[in-house]
């Protein structure tokens, strides 16, 4: 995918923190650029479930408007503390060392970014788990899919129930967007 090689300063800082923490499970730059572009369209409160060391948060921060803020939840205190150092002087980003479910009372959110496999695992109901956390017209971005051109969608030799649920849930308009030959995201807008 075509993109300028330079990264926003806040994203570079997040990569540095991730490297020092030995944390390598973060969103790709292609996904990050998409997050920044989507964040630029949102006002109010954006949220991320699964901060890691803050790379996804940094991409969101690089795009948010003046009338927006970000709440991000990371269950692992060590990772949350590392991410918090990136945003220590930024009153528009709050990093919380909590389970994502504790943010239920802080919504609804205008944009919600989360890993496709957590917390909306199909065992928990997928979109049912998220629906009340997103405002009408709000956007959910689910990361970490492998592109699939078949229907029903297949992952690791089985029907990808989570992807199928999101793509067919009538409460959302959802599209799978390929961000690289080996990576895709789902973008779901609440009706």
Name each region found by the language model.
Residues 47, 73, 114, 137-144:
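Active-site flanking residues adjacent to catalytic metal/cofactor-binding acidic residues
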Residues 120-191:
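C-terminal substrate-binding/active-site "lid" region of AdoMet-derived donor-dependent transferases
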